[in-house]
């Protein structure tokens, strides 16, 4: 049953506690399907009932990874490419310069905070075609109440078919046990859904996956993750946009490829099996 208060701390805990008590003879796997829900689960892991399984990293690590600037520093450490990036900080002078041409991409560093402050022309990602438009949209975002950083990036040319998506699962010990790379053929093109994948086929790339494995295991990452990637034909490199600390909206491509995403959690946390 839908409730608009479910993404608030108190109501979330009240709802989860009630469900756990109602099913106290069962093991309950708690899965978040959006960034705000995943953050709530991670933040309150220690307060959850004993029969609830919450397969997520600690909140401090999750919160830092949600910040795109932190993620790009990790990319540099592990040789993972990402687009040319300028981080605009709230209150910064508007006379800054960027080292790449228009059009550019503009998006919030903290998407959870961003969606908490809706406005009529709000988009998930903006394609900005001039400096005048950039200044105008930045002002509009901050006037709506968002107060964190904004990410301005080089726009990588190419349509939906240049996109890739990488999903993985890491066990309790921080070891990657499953990786599945998908080649995106079509995305959604609505203001709030831009960038969500609609059609995907699997297409492995061992070198790319190896770099990501090293990054995740260095972090001792636990649970599902999802990367958005785009192939840059200008230099032949795959550029990483961000990490989602959860399974993706379109993750059925993983199950369809033979990796049942539910099975990994159930076998490890419910049946206590060691994943191969």
Predicted regions and their residues:
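Glycine-rich phosphate-binding loop signature in dinucleotide/nucleotide-binding domains
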Residues: 19-27, 99-100
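A short, GP-enriched loop/loop-strand-helix hinge that lies immediately N-terminal to
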Residues: 23-66, 81-84
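Cysteine/selenocysteine-centered motifs that mediate thiol-based redox chemistry or coordinate metal-sulfur cofactors
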Residues: 273-276
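A short glycine-rich, hydrophobically flanked beta-strand micro-motif that places a catalytic Asp/Glu
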Residues: 153-154, 222-234
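ATP-dependent carboxylate/phosphate-activation module, predominantly the ATP-grasp catalytic core
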Residues: 123-125, 129-132, 136, 154-220, ...
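A short beta-strand motif that forms the metal-chelation/ATP-contact edge
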Residues: 236-246
């Amino acid at each position: 049953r839908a409730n608009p208060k479910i993404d608030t701390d108190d109501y979330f805990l009240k709802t989860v506690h009630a469900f756990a008590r109602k099913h106290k003879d069962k093991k309950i796997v708690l899965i978040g399907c959006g960034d705000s829900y995943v953050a709530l689960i991670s933040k309150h892991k220690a307060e959850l009932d004993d029969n609830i399984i919450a397969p997520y990293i600690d909140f401090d690590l999750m919160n830092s990874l949600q910040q795109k600037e932190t993620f790009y520093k990790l990319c540099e450490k592990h040789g993972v490419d990402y687009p040319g990036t300028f981080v605009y900080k709230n209150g910064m002078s508007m006379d800054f310069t960027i080292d790449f041409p228009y059009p550019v991409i503009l998006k919030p560093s903290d998407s959870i905070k961003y969606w908490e402050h809706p406005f009529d022309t709000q988009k998930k990602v903006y394609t900005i075609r001039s400096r005048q438009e950039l200044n105008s949209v930045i002002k509009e975002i901050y006037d709506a109440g968002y107060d964190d950083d904004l990410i301005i990036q080089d726009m990588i040319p190419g349509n939906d078919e240049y996109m890739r998506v990488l999903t993985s699962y890491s066990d309790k010990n921080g070891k990657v046990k499953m990786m599945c790379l998908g080649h995106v053929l079509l995305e959604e093109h609505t203001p709030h859904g831009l960038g969500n994948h609609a059609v995907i086929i699997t297409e492995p790339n061992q070198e790319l996956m190896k770099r990501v494995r090293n990054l995740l295991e260095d972090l001792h990452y636990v649970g599902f993750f999802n990367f958005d990637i785009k192939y840059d034909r200008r230099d032949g490199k795959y550029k990483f946009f961000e990490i989602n600390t959860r399974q993706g909206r379109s993750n059925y491509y993983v199950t369809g490829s033979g990796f049942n995403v539910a099975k990994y959690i159930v076998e490890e946390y419910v049946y206590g099996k060691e994943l191969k």
